[in-house]
A protein has these predicted regions:
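A short, surface-exposed helix-loop junction/capping segment
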Residues: 1-5
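Soluble catalytic domains of membrane acyltransferases
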Residues: 26-187
Length: 187
């Protein structure tokens, strides 16, 4: 599979999963709708397209939901899934965000596909060439499992969708699953 060793990914998901489970499932009472649409998806070439409200809670919630789905627990998150998580999950993330500290670096081991943003760096608008290797890495992720993308490329609401997403869809023809995240700004 693409990315880090599966054993390492499973360990990171297990370690990060326990404290985040409490926050997501107990304190904030994550509400999941539309889970029935995910049950019969193939194990590879599935592309989740989502809005982005926080730096990490969105992705962590996806991991909890997908691992829970693997075990067949339905809408109620049961942390036993952390003992054998779905490890073929990948997510597109800004390289600068994932290199900014120990916790982001740890999370990146769980399946980050790092992208060098062409329009923004360290909070400042920039103009640089598009990172063409990012599309290749997303393709490898799709061949190995499920990929989560936040095509707005920012946590700002109503930002335009970046063009790379359409290129990935056209070249890979994945199953595309649109996702709406709501409420993390209040969490």
């Amino acid at each position: 599979p693409f990315g880090n060793w599966m054993v390492l990914k499973r360990m990171v998901i297990f370690i990060a999963g326990w404290p985040t489970y409490w926050r997501i499932a107990i304190a904030n009472k994550l509400k999941i709708e539309g889970l029935e649409h995910l049950k019969d998806l193939p194990n590879t070439n599935v592309f989740f397209i989502s809005n982005h409200q926080t730096y990490f809670a969105d992705v962590i919630s996806f991991y909890h939901i997908f691992c829970n789905l693997k075990w067949g627990f339905g809408k109620k998150l049961m942390p036993i899934y952390l003992f054998s998580p779905r490890a073929t999950i990948y997510y597109v993330a800004a390289k600068e965000t994932m290199k900014s500290g120990l916790i982001p670096k740890l999370f990146s081991l769980a399946g980050a596909i790092l992208v060098e943003r062409s329009w923004r760096a360290e909070g400042v608008n920039v103009k640089r060439e598009v990172d063409t290797s990012a599309g290749d890495n997303v393709t490898m992720g799709l061949k190995s499992g499920w990929v989560i993308s936040f095509p707005q490329g920012t946590t700002s609401p109503y930002a335009p969708v970046r063009k790379g997403t359409s290129h990935i869809i056209l070249s890979n023809r994945p199953v595309v699953v649109p996702v709406v995240i709501n409420g993390f700004r209040r969490a």
